[in-house]
């Protein structure tokens, strides 16, 4: 099932796409795509609905972030062996974890803002994992039972803030609009193998990233289990699982986003995003 949120920022409503691609309103069955509504059992109830009987939503609606109420936006660094190689970094012996501020989350097609003082704003297409029920000390074998579904995440990164300004990566990852999420939350039953998802990213029509989740160092089940040993994962938490090669900092010479650029990215079966880049006010 493809779940989404539509409407003006801060007032999005829950919806879904039917087989014909028509947007249907879900607000008569769930208040929002957050909290208990993301539990796999609740999602199964939604999947049993006759979508043709739901109200159709007319017009060209803005899509918001596909999940609401995200408490933790957890990112995994250097989790693709081919991406680690392009940056000259060693493959980590354990997952590298950092946090992205939830205030960075925006819709999949909202404008991407270059922050003040930025000279190295970079792109990263990533597979997002959305938690559906509380996970604490879970095994790898049972980890996917706690997943609601998957989405596209653009882990926008300011490399000077991230690397050159010392300390944790967080400040280079958390600028406003640096977390476009969606267009859809695709329930896990429609993603039989999260470790075999082609993904891509283009800047101004030029392909920059063309990879697959099959080159992840640590897979989805391992990451959910691993993280749950250190913190409880709550419904609506997002795990952004790393990026394949082709980021701007790995190019020779490096290449970064500038105002006027257009970024498009997507993952097979999970939809695509498109952002216009402009300077922050």
In which residue ranges do the predicted regions lie?
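N-terminal accessory regions of nucleic-acid-interacting proteins
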Residues: 136-150
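Short, structured patches in soluble enzyme cores that scaffold and shape functional sites
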Residues: 100-102, 109, 116, 123-127, ...
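Structural signature of FAD isoalloxazine-binding scaffolds in flavoprotein oxidoreductases
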Residues: 8, 91-108, 121-123, 258-269
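Catalytic-pocket segment enriched in acidic/His residues
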Residues: 5, 9-10, 54-58, 62-66, ...
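Short catalytic-site patches enriched in acidic/histidine residues
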Residues: 96-115, 135-136, 177-186, 244-248
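Short helix-loop capping/hinge motifs at secondary-structure junctions, enriched
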Residues: 135-138, 190-192
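N-terminal non-catalytic cap/leader segment that marks the start of a structured domain
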Residues: 1-95, 264, 281
């Amino acid at each position: 099932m493809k779940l989404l949120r539509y409407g003006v920022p801060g007032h999005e409503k829950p919806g879904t796409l039917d087989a014909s691609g028509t947007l249907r309103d879900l607000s008569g069955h769930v208040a929002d795509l957050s909290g208990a509504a993301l539990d796999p059992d609740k999602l199964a109830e939604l999947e049993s609905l006759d979508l043709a009987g739901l109200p159709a939503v007319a017009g060209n609606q803005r899509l918001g972030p596909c999940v609401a109420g995200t408490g933790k936006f957890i990112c995994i660094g250097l989790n693709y062996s081919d991406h680690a190689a392009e940056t000259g970094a060693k493959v980590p012996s354990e997952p590298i974890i950092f946090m992205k501020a939830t205030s960075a989350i925006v819709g999949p097609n909202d404008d991407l803002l270059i922050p003040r003082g930025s000279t190295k704003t970079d792109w990263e297409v990533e597979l997002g994992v959305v938690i559906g029920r509380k996970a604490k000390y879970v095994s790898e074998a049972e980890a996917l039972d706690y997943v609601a579904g998957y989405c596209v995440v653009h882990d926008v990164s300011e490399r000077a803030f991230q690397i050159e300004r010392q300390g944790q990566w967080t400040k280079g990852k958390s600028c406003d609009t640096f977390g476009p999420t969606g267009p859809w939350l695709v329930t896990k039953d429609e993603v039989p193998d999260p470790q075999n998802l082609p993904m891509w990213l283009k800047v101004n029509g030029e392909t920059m990233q063309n990879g697959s989740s099959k080159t992840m160092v640590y897979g989805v089940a391992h990451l959910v289990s691993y993280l749950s040993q250190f913190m409880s994962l709550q419904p609506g938490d997002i795990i952004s699982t790393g990026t394949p090669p082709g980021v701007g900092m790995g190019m020779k010479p490096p290449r970064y986003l500038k105002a006027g650029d257009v970024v498009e990215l997507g993952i097979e079966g999970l939809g695509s995003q498109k952002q216009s880049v402009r300077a922050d006010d």
